[in-house]
């Protein structure tokens, strides 16, 4: 889910928010063709060894801000000679630059690329790319029956541009030892302070038929300011943001979006290609193939592919970055680099990959520097016993028991030489020193409560969590002010047996409510009861208020932020419920749930129950149902952010199919009514490459018997001022009740394809990820 990714990024950005802005200067001017004197659009203008810069507009003009009083201005574009000069932005000058066209020779073909007159017809670069696309699978390792490789991966987050001037700011003066941990980025050359580091050592396995991909994790290490967050949840979110990249696919997944690959089947209609020059890489002569999207706001890349000049069209190196005008939330800069080598039989092997990102929350802040580096080695195409063992496991990622507790000697022996950085590998020491200061210690505690909602009873391996804290104080029309206290046990108390509960009290109705739950897990858990996969038996008793027509998917009804309503909430009664549930989840994505439930719905002065006897109505205090329920769910390749109490999807690419049926018989175990209720649903995200994506949710349901209104189907109304998925913000609670329905929710995200074309969006830097949404609830 995109809100989860943004929240994780915002955690790191919070560290940089309070840094005062330094003096800023303006760099502006115009770029023209030296021969025609026509303005040149989409020209790269930047300060050397920094990410500060911009691209020229349609009139050739450029404008950007910098806090540097001196620097080297570099202006470059495809088909022209690069221009550079020393400038002093503090002097507030306007620069007029005329670029001279460049001429390149390649295979005795003369290419003079001119951006203003780009043509696909009879273009040697386009023909070159078409031949590359035709042969892109010829030497793919996935054409082999089997392969395996060792992987070392390191992901770091750092405060960006942590220079001497920033170190003097009041926020950091208390922590003068931070200078000991300042490093220099090998990509941007900026001083950075690493505040989070993650390392992974694993072996990847691939089998063509039957198709299977596994990863055997031998070591995993984490240290930094994000330690208080769910380890599994953060790892899932980071894996979704920094996915493995295959430039030979039609689409490249990064930052929960999909971008058109330069080697996509539709590449020649999406990109402009240029043959720039020839050069030697690893002893082989390669062509420098440059590319840029026709539309600089579209979800694609600028970059270079270095391709061997032989019949294999082998890519030795790839360099990709985002167009400057792309609007991608907090992402201000991105650089993706890949290096390939050949096996003895010519198979293409990925040797090294790095993704460098600069995140910014607001202009004027240096933000966060993030980098993921992966080194691959020890490729083999012969199956091994270890591989056979991995393929017998149901899970895709197999983690060794001691993977999280490897000693430092293990990492020192297994880190590649290029990954050895004293500052990056000293985050443990940095965090220990920071926590020695009360101001940081308590700030971290507060952030932990805000992000997780729970208070652990101990720093290491807590036996019990108190919370959720956002439900401690709330209120509604029936109860008036309401207080609640609760918590849950963890796997550190018992890895199989878990308890959860709360007690709540309303000062207006003066009634005590509560929940008591005991769950036995047949699988040993690491931290929480709801870790995937769940295989458990749970007994639960709950007595509380029932807010009819308000059932939220990802938050508690007691959330304090839901207490403020746009409409008077006077559709509230009471209920008591006892249930026993058996749940079994499988790695295939299939799960089922069997529940036996006894429920009593009780009226209140806000929701009276009346029974019609002839022409007269008599009040009914309550009614009961004894029901059995079966739920089936299938969500292959589903990925989610795991928290202490819930799961939030981090990707909607996987389809989700659901089917459930509830049955109750009048007179059976004291049930007052016969009740049959069937629900079915499907949801899926569909990607249209360069044309965005659409999210589709289809649901249908039917109550097959004549029942009182609390047992009917009520559309989910959202009376709060928050955004809640699959709820109706313009509908009131119990405004509609029905015994059958069909609903569809379709949202089409254009990825800036239309809205960002308007000048007002470009000039105001508004969010350009336009979308269209349709929602329908058909009922009877």
Label each residue range with its predicted role.
Residues 25-27, 34-49, 68:
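Short, ordered, surface-exposed loop/turn motifs in non-cytosolic proteins
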Residues 27-33, 60, 97:
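A short, amphipathic beta-strand motif
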Residues 88-114:
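Extracellular beta-sheet/turn segments enriched in Thr/Pro/Gly and aliphatic residues
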Residues 47-49, 72-85:
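A short, solvent-exposed loop/turn motif at the edges and junctions
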Residues 43-47, 73, 111, 320, ...:
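Hydrophobic beta-strand segments
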Residues 257-259, 391-780:
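Exposed, low-structure sequence patches enriched in small/polar residues
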Residues 104, 110, 114-286, 292-300, ...:
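Structured extracytoplasmic
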Residues 51-61:
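Short, acidic Ser/Thr/Gly-rich low-complexity loop/linker segments typical of extracellular
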């Amino acid at each position: 889910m995109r809100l989860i990714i943004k929240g994780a990024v915002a955690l790191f950005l919070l560290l940089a928010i309070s840094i005062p802005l330094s003096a800023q200067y303006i760099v502006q001017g115009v770029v023209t063709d030296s021969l025609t004197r026509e303005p040149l659009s989409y020209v790269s203008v930047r300060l050397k060894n920094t990410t500060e810069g911009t691209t020229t507009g349609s009139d050739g003009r450029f404008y950007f801000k910098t806090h540097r009083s001196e620097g080297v201005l570099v202006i470059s574009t495809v088909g022209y000679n690069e221009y550079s000069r020393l400038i002093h932005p503090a002097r507030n000058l306007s620069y007029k630059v005329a670029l001279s066209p460049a001429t390149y020779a390649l295979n005795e073909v003369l290419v003079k690329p001119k951006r203003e007159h780009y043509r696909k017809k009879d273009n040697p670069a386009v023909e070159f790319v078409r031949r590359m696309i035709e042969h892109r699978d010829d030497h793919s390792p996935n054409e082999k029956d089997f392969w395996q490789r060792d992987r070392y991966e390191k992901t770091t987050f750092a405060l960006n541009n942590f220079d001497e001037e920033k170190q003097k700011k009041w926020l950091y003066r208390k922590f003068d030892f931070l200078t000991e941990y300042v490093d220099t980025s090998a990509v941007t050359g900026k001083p950075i302070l690493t505040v989070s580091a993650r390392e992974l050592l694993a072996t990847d396995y691939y089998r063509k038929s039957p198709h299977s991909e596994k990863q055997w994790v031998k070591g995993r290490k984490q240290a930094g300011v994000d330690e208080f967050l769910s380890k599994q949840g953060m790892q899932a979110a980071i894996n979704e943001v920094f996915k493995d990249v295959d430039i030979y696919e039609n689409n490249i997944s990064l930052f929960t979006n999909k971008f058109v690959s330069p080697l996509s089947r539709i590449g020649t209609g999406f990109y402009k290609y240029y043959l720039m020059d020839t050069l030697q890489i690893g002893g082989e002569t390669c062509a420098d193939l440059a590319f840029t999207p026709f539309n600089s706001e579209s979800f694609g890349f600028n970059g270079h592919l270095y391709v061997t000049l032989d019949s294999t069209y082998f890519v030795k190196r790839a360099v990709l970055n985002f167009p400057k005008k792309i609007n991608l939330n907090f992402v201000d800069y991105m650089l993706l680099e890949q290096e390939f080598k050949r096996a003895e039989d010519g198979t293409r092997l990925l040797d090294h990959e790095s993704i460098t990102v600069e995140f910014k929350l607001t202009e004027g802040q240096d933000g966060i520097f993030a980098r993921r580096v992966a080194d691959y080695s020890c490729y083999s195409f012969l199956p091994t016993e270890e591989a056979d063992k991995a393929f017998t496991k149901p899970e895709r990622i197999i983690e060794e028991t001691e993977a999280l507790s490897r000693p430092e000697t293990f990492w020192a022996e297994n880190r590649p030489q290029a990954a050895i950085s004293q500052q990056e590998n000293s985050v443990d020491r940095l965090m220990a020193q920071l926590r020695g200061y009360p101001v940081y210690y308590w700030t971290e505690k507060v952030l932990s409560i805000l992000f997780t909602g729970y208070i652990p009873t101990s720093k290491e391996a807590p036996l019990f969590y108190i919370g959720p804290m956002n439900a401690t104080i709330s209120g509604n029309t029936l109860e008036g002010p309401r207080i609640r206290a609760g918590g849950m046990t963890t796997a550190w108390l018992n890895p199989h047996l878990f308890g959860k509960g709360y007690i709540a009290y309303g000062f207006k109705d003066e009634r005590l409510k509560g929940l008591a739950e005991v769950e036995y897990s047949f699988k040993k858990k690491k931290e929480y009861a709801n870790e995937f996969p769940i295989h458990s038996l749970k007994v639960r008793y709950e007595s509380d208020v029932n807010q009819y027509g308000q059932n939220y998917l990802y938050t508690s009804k007691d959330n304090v932020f839901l207490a403020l309503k746009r409409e008077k909430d006077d559709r509230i009664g009471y209920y008591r419920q006892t249930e026993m549930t058996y749940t079994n989840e499988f790695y295939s994505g299939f799960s089922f749930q069997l529940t036996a439930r006894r429920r009593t719905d009780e009226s209140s002065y806000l929701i009276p129950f009346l029974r019609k006897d002839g022409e007269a109505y008599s009040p009914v205090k309550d009614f009961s149902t004894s029901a059995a329920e079966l739920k089936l769910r299938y969500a292959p390749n589903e990925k989610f952010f795991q928290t202490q109490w819930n799961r939030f999807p981090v990707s909607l690419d996987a389809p989700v199919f659901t089917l459930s049926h509830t049955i109750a018989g009048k007179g059976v175990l004291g049930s007052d009514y016969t009740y049959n209720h069937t629900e079915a649903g499907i949801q899926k995200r569909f990607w249209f490459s360069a044309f965005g994506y659409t999210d589709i949710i289809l649901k249908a349901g039917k109550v097959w018997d004549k029942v009182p209104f609390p047992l009917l189907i009520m559309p989910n109304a959202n009376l709060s001022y928050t955004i809640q998925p699959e709820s109706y913000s313009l509908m009131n609670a119990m405004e509609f009740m029905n015994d059958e329905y069909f609903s569809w929710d379709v949202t089409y995200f254009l990825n800036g394809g239309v809205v960002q074309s308007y000048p007002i969006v470009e000039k105001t830097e508004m969010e350009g990820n336009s979308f269209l949404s349709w929602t329908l609830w058909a009922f009877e």
